[in-house]
């Protein structure tokens, strides 16, 4: 499995102590206060290739039908990741009518040679099923190994992208409950509408 071993629990209450530049859905740059648990990330999803947990090819077209996609990077070893997955599944169903989809990316599906690990893929499939996380899940594979994985310092990490795969706002580190994510989803969705 991949060398990523850090796991973050529930995020603390937001702390608006530092300002960062934020990329919006229109590509404009504006200043927004950075909250605790947020991190900037580059636009690795505008052009990528990978496989889902069942071996099907996936690329940036996965974002086309949603106004906003919440990408949750998780690990099979990460208890906080697994604990928030049922809430994410509920949010995926509740926000579909608003043009939002949730996609998971399992961070530990490759071996030291950057090849897919079948045992880890099976474990990821089982955990997604056990947690009721019935939204799409992508394996850390293809171009994501070199573009996304180096940016993942801990899991869960959540990134929002628009229909073209352009990142919206900052990346969020750590798990949250359903209400916490709903508030963030509402705020980010408003910024792309």
Where on the chain are the PLM-derived regions?
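Thiol-based oxidoreductase modules, predominantly thioredoxin-like and allied folds used
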Residues: 99-121, 133-142
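A short beta-strand-turn-helix
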Residues: 47-69, 93-94
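Conserved redox-active cysteine motifs that mediate thiol-disulfide chemistry
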Residues: 73-90
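Short, internal strand/loop/helix patches
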Residues: 120-161
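C-terminal motif of bacterial Sec signal peptides marking the signal peptidase cleavage site
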Residues: 3-6
